[in-house]
């Protein structure tokens, strides 16, 4: 069919010369015009070329100026009309030739189909030539010899055999290619179904409707990580399933948690690796991509939250988040490769004392991120808020704040418990019967949690609230007690840990504690001061004339609290002798000093070391055979 096409050239044919000029003739012309080749150099040729260019430019300018002067508008219009007439003449000539050819064919066909042929004839042809006046006959070709006929049959048979062989080869190649294609497609779809049977979600790619993808990310993550959680499942040449490397993380990453104590790394979390049995399988690659994407989102959210916690001591560097737990201990979080050799630490690790703490923190931040995803899902399923021109702010996830609150709260609770044990150990060594009880995390109440919420979410929600621990302590005098509430809150102001002391001293009802205490030293000073006040009240009540001890021991004197807030008591005997007693209580010891005073010295604050008759007794924590405080008071109270 390609040979039957008719092409009409629109460009004029260029006639070739019948006799092209021979090379000797051209050389002779060059010698006659330019001289011998020996006299030709590059400089002379360049100069000649420049000279010719300048001449041509000058001639063109002169011709242009002359032509512009000679040709006017009328002549230009005449030329345009002439060109138009020539084009019309050529078109008319082509039309006439086409009509002549059509009349010829129509007259020829009028012999057999006159009605159809008459419709395409011109009016002039119908007048001058009757229908069917032109006919055509088939002339039989000259007879061929048997040898020619035999050769023709042989050649045609050879062509047919060759075409049959070529067709057979093409069919075999197509069959083998189809077989390979079926095998590769079968393997591809088997692996796709295996991925689906594992529980992975399969879907079409958004802008590639013919390509399948696997959703390994988390739909409730932030948009930048949610969009990266979809990868294409492509087919290799042999039909193996290939996970598209477009958005899949190339290397595995994990968040490492380290504990630094006194400037030394004392704990490091274990590297988190994928749970796939075969890391090179398609499932192993999907699991690695999911875990790495989760770890990258976790560190991104940690970094994002750390930026708003600079006032609480959280610092960020290029690839690290650091926050303090106490003055001696810090927590470091960074994103590293779990398979690198220097995973444990690039510095020298002195001990592994806090490895359990580091692992617990690593698990906690991952659980908190999953909880944040659950909250995003819960908000997404609720009715949307009213439309507003202001863009809604996406709050930072609570990842660092809960663990910081827990660690700081635990540190302050341990300090307070140690302090109370030391103080009450001193009191018990002095023979004073008193005790205290601690209720850690009294704010966590799982019994009142919302039953519509899963238990895990309810438990996490309890630890996101401000943490509170209560210490209840009994004192020496009846109905005297105090409570210390340790409250830690890092979500809303005021941030940090605060101590609140509730005091019940019947002997000093006007004494109250400050509302909020933020420092250890202040809390320790206030607690020891309250206990010292109760000791002074106990000594005063025991040696008062109404007490049973005073009645049995008539020769003993009574003590009166003159400056109770300074731990000072005064006793006056019948003969007018006066004594002072000073009670000093600290975390490590209880000291009682007695000395004689005269006259107006009873109201003075003299230094005990410079007074006569000074007696001192000290009790420290631990077992002792010395008399107790009340026995010592009874001994020094003898007249």
From Swiss-Prot:
Regions annotated as coiled coil: 160-187
Any GO BP annotation: regulation of transcription by RNA polymerase II
UniProt keyword list: Activator, Coiled coil, Nucleus, Transcription, Transcription regulation
Superkingdom of this protein's organism: Eukaryota
Keyword set includes Transcription regulation: yes
GO molecular function ontology, one term from the record: transcription coregulator activity
A GO CC term attached to the entry: core mediator complex
Intrachain S-S bonds: none
Subcellular location: Nucleus
Pfam families hit by this protein: Med17 (PF10156)
Record's function text: Component of the Mediator complex, a coactivator involved in the regulated transcription of nearly all RNA polymerase II-dependent genes. Mediator functions as a bridge to convey information from gene-specific regulatory proteins to the basal RNA polymerase II transcription machinery. Mediator is recruited to promoters by direct interactions with regulatory proteins and serves as a scaffold for the assembly of a functional preinitiation complex with RNA polymerase II and the general transcription factors.
Subunit organization: Component of the Mediator complex.
Protein family membership: Belongs to the Mediator complex subunit 17 family.
Descriptive protein name: Mediator of RNA polymerase II transcription subunit 17
Record organism: Neosartorya fischeri (strain ATCC 1020 / DSM 3700 / CBS 544.65 / FGSC A1164 / JCM 1740 / NRRL 181 / WB 181) (Aspergillus fischerianus)
